[in-house]
C-alpha cells in the first residue's frame, strides 16, 4: 500500500461519517475543532445516528463512507445477520475507537439480582446485534432463559439512557461514560461483561473495503487525525481546552459530566486504546458470541476476515 502523502488531499471529496451520539466521540470533536482533519485536506461531515439499523443502512447504500460502531455490527452486517435487511459484504474494521472498560448492565435501583429481572423488560439498540449479545450471555449466566424477560428495541445509547431514567424498562447495557453517569444518579450496576469474558472489542472505525481501496489516502488521513486527537486528549495540559470542546458538543452537560467522561475514557490503563490498537482476542470473543446467538446461524471466519490493520499502520508511519 502506498504510504500517505499529506500534500495532496485538498481535492478529496468530503468524508461522510456516521456515529452514535455520546462522549465517546470526543476524539472526533477534537479532530474537527482543532483542525486535525483540515490539516490533511479533509472535510468530514459528521451525522449522529438514532441506532445501528439507520447507520448500517446508510453505509450499505453509500450515504455514509465511515462509521464508528460496535465490532459486532461489522461482523453481523458482513455475514447477513444484521437487524436491518441489508448486507455489507466487504465491511471491515480499521481502527479501535473505544475505552477498554467492559459494558455494564445498569438497572433500576430496586433490581438487586438477576432473579428480580424475571418478567421485566430490558432495552437494546437492536435485538440481533451489538451489545444485545452480551446482554443475552449475562442473562444466561444469571439463570434466565428467553421467555423469562422481554426485549424492547429503544435505539442508540442516548435512547436507552433517557428511557431508563423515565422508568420505561428495568435495565440495559451501557458503555462508559454512560454507565458511570447512571451510577452517579443512583442506578444499579448489576453486573458487567467482565463476568462472562476477559476480552471484548467494542467500538471501531469501520468502512467498506471497496471504499477504503478507492480512498486509501483519505482514510489514512482520517485515522491519523483521530489517533492524534486521542494523544492530545491524553495530555493533561490540554484538559481545559478539551472540556471546552466537550461543552460545545454537549451543551446540556456541565464540567462535572465532562470530568466523569474524561476520567473513564482517558484513564491511562482502561481508557481509549492508544494508536487505535484493536484487541484481536476481543474480536475473537465477538465471533464466539455471534456464533452462539447470531441469526441465521452460520460459520464465521477468523478475526482477520473482519479487520484490516494496513490503513492504520500506514497512517501511523506517516505521522512519526
List each model region and its residues.
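Short, glycine-/small- and polar/acidic-enriched structural segments
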Residues: 2-147, 151-155, 160-163, 170-176
Amino acid at each position: 500500500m502506498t504510504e500517505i502523502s499529506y500534500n495532496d488531499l485538498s481535492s478529496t471529496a468530503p468524508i461522510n461519517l456516521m456515529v452514535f451520539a455520546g462522549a465517546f466521540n470526543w476524539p472526533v470533536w477534537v479532530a474537527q475543532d482543532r483542525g486535525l482533519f483540515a490539516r490533511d485536506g479533509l472535510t468530514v461531515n459528521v451525522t449522529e445516528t438514532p441506532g445501528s439499523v439507520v447507520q448500517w443502512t446508510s453505509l450499505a447504500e453509500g450515504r455514509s463512507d465511515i462509521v464508528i460502531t460496535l465490532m459486532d455490527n461489522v461482523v453481523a452486517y458482513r455475514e447477513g445477520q444484521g437487524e436491518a435487511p441489508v448486507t455489507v459484504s466487504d465491511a471491515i474494521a480499521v481502527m479501535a475507537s473505544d475505552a477498554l472498560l467492559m459494558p455494564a448492565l445498569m438497572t433500576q435501583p430496586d433490581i438487586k439480582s438477576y432473579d428480580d429481572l424475571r418478567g421485566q423488560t430490558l432495552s437494546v439498540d437492536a435485538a440481533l446485534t451489538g451489545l444485545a449479545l452480551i446482554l443475552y450471555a449475562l442473562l444466561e449466566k444469571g439463570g434466565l432463559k428467553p421467555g423469562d424477560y422481554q426485549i424492547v428495541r429503544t435505539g442508540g445509547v442516548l435512547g436507552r439512557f433517557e428511557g431508563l431514567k423515565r422508568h420505561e424498562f428495568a435495565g440495559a447495557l451501557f458503555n462508559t461514560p454512560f454507565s458511570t453517569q447512571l451510577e452517579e444518579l443512583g442506578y444499579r450496576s448489576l453486573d458487567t461483561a467482565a463476568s462472562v469474558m476477559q476480552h471484548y472489542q467494542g467500538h471501531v472505525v469501520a468502512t467498506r473495503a471497496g471504499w477504503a481501496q478507492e480512498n486509501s489516502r483519505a482514510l489514512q488521513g482520517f485515522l491519523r487525525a483521530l489517533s492524534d486527537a486521542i494523544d492530545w486528549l491524553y495530555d493533561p495540559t490540554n484538559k481545559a481546552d478539551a472540556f471546552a470542546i466537550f461543552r460545545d458538543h454537549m451543551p446540556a452537560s456541565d464540567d462535572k459530566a465532562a470530568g466523569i467522561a474524561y476520567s473513564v475514557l482517558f484513564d491511562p490503563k482502561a481508557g481509549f486504546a492508544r494508536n487505535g490498537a484493536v484487541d484481536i482476542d476481543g474480536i475473537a470473543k465477538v465471533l464466539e458470541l455471534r456464533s452462539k446467538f447470531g441469526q441465521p446461524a452460520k460459520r464465521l471466519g477468523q478475526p482477520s476476515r473482519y479487520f484490516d490493520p494496513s490503513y492504520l499502520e500506514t497512517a501511523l508511519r506517516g505521522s512519526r
